[in-house]
Swiss-Prot record:
The gene is hemE. It comes from Cereibacter sphaeroides (strain ATCC 17029 / ATH 2.4.9). This is Uroporphyrinogen decarboxylase. InterPro entries: UROD/MetE-like_sf (IPR038071), Uroporphyrinogen_deCO2ase_HemE (IPR006361), Uroporphyrinogen_deCOase (IPR000257). One of its GO terms (cellular component) is cytosol. It catalyses: uroporphyrinogen III + 4 H(+) = coproporphyrinogen III + 4 CO2. The record marks 73 as: Transition state stabilizer. Belongs to the uroporphyrinogen decarboxylase family. It is an enzyme of class 4 (lyase). Catalyzes the decarboxylation of four acetate groups of uroporphyrinogen-III to yield coproporphyrinogen-III. Homodimer.
């Protein structure tokens, strides 16, 4: 097996960690901005396979990352389930809201999502053909809790108050929504794998707002179900899980869910994560602060070396603790890659 990303996901400790970045296809790159302008708007970019494939390939051409991640959005799935989705300039995504069981039952079934998502699968097929042979191809979806927070509130929020309210005041409706999203997520990811994705990543951006038993019930349990069903269909499929800002919840997350790798954010130190999460055997992905992609210089070099050093005694995939920001300097990403690869 020559793909370093897949070797790390199988538990191999490598002298140089594979590297890719969350949101590596993004607004910090001039070529991305040009292609997005060509598409007209963000959703059109997601749903135009040739252009979505192009922006996926751009950071691979520029930096030679070890992995490419499908260009899409976690909110395409709720749109396929029947939610209205639009993006407001400077405000981010907006959706129609689900606040009761009636709203849940009005959603499409898990087998009815594929017509809307067909362009995404075509993007996967294009990339499976066009990516360099050494580049691992990652598909992804949002985790049910995070997707549900948007479906309930109609927008992102700092505290996910609307989702917590539904969870605490109408548990049957909340659990029914989680079930519908979980089932659809499994089918969505299965189609991505059938179309050529070699790895899938589960993004639980708002997992940190789940505490105690709620974290077990609505972050761990859905991840375990998704991982087990996908691995039953695709034996050996590597899965990366990212329960962002889980803190102590990162400990044992891979073991509890069956994920092959746990991605961690930069609110925890690499040394803590190496001891408590990686523990010499569990593949960890992360966790450089994205701010260094803006500031650059010797600070970036030293912070990068610290992350590499912390995780060098176990399987590690180098990434940021969160997505690269539009303010990042493309030259700083070059410096990052050169620092890791010792160029």
């Amino acid at each position: 097996m020559t793909k370093t990303m897949l070797r790390a996901l199988k538990g191999e400790t490598l002298p140089t960690p594979p590297i890719w970045l969350m949101r590596q296809a993004g607004r910090y790159l001039p070529e991305y901005r040009a292609t997005r302008a060509q598409a007209g708007d963000f959703l059109s970019l997601c749903y135009t396979p040739d252009l979505a494939a192009e922006v996926t390939l751009q950071p691979i051409r520029r930096y030679g990352f070890d992995a490419a991640i499908l260009f899409a959005d976690i909110l395409l799935l709720p749109q396929a389930l029947g939610a209205d989705l639009w993006f407001e300039t400077g405000e981010g995504p907006r959706m129609s809201t689900i606040t009761d069981m009636e709203g849940v039952t009005a959603l499409k079934g898990r087998d009815d999502i594929h017509e809307t998502l067909a362009p995404v699968y075509e993007t996967c097929r294009i990339l499976a053909r066009e990516l360099p042979k050494e580049t691992t191809f990652i598909g992804f979806a949002g985790m049910p809790w995070t997707v549900a927070t948007y479906m309930i509130a109609g927008r992102g929020s700092k505290d996910q108050a609307a989702a917590h309210k539904l969870k605490d005041t109408d548990r049957p409706a909340f659990e029914a929504l989680m079930d519908r999203v979980t089932e659809a997520t499994i089918e969505y990811l299965a189609k991505q794998v059938e179309a050529g994705c070699e790895v899938v990543k589960l993004f639980d951006s708002w997992a940190g707002s789940l505490k105690g038993q709620d974290f077990e019930d609505f972050a761990v349990a859905p991840a375990k179900r998704i991982v087990s069903e996908l691995k039953a269909r695709f034996p050996g499929l590597p899965v990366i899980a990212f329960p962002r800002e889980a803190g102590e919840g990162y400990i044992g997350f891979a073991e509890k869910t069956g994920a092959d790798c746990v991605a961690i954010d930069n609110s925890v130190s690499p040394e803590w994560a190496a001891e408590k999460v990686q523990a010499g055997r569990t593949c960890v992905q992360g966790n450089l602060d994205p701010k260094y992609m803006v500031t650059g210089g010797e600070e970036l070099v030293q912070a990068t070396k610290r992350v590499v050093e912390a995780f060098r005694n176990g399987p590690h995939i180098f990434n940021l603790g969160h997505g690269i920001t539009p303010e990042a300097d493309p030259e700083n990403v070059t410096l990052l890659v050169e620092t890791i690869r010792g160029k």
